[in-house]
Amino acid sequence: MSELSLQDVAVSYGRRVAVEPFSDTIAPGEWVGLIGPNGAGKSSLLRSIAGLVRHAGSIEVDGTRLGDLKDRERAQRVAYVPQEPLIPDDMTVTDYVLLGRTPYIGYWSSESKHDRDVVADTLERLRLGEFAPRLLGALSGGERQRVVLARALAQEAPILLLDEP
């Protein structure tokens, strides 16, 4: 568990302000829900924490500024499940969830026994073990949602962001 600190985080797309300056500290183990109407900036805030959107202000995990980290280091601290994940139909469930262990090209080693064990355990916890060898394109919508969640959980990041999963 880690502390997440947001200091004057703001997001804009051109002249359109998506997130007004926002500050908060979320303690280890605390659960927080962002509630608001469409266009209120909930997804933009989550995407900025995940490092997918440029933002003003500071985002820190346990005192470390996320903006100072390389993508790989950030992924070890923050896992993100987007509203509409890209799911390749021709990849197996196991290989897709393995990407959560090593989410950036150049770091993926499907030969790691530890990574494969974590993926197998994660799939079992979500009752997806029997789906491991299947292609993602053969799964139902609900099964695919659970696989996307498994990928994020397999990262074993202390912070998990769920954008309307």
Task: Give the positions of each predicted feature.
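The feature captures the beta-strand-to-loop junction immediately N-terminal to the Walker
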Residues: 35-37
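Helix-to-loop junction immediately C-terminal to a conserved catalytic motif
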Residues: 50
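Conserved ABC ATPase signature
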Residues: 110, 135-139, 143
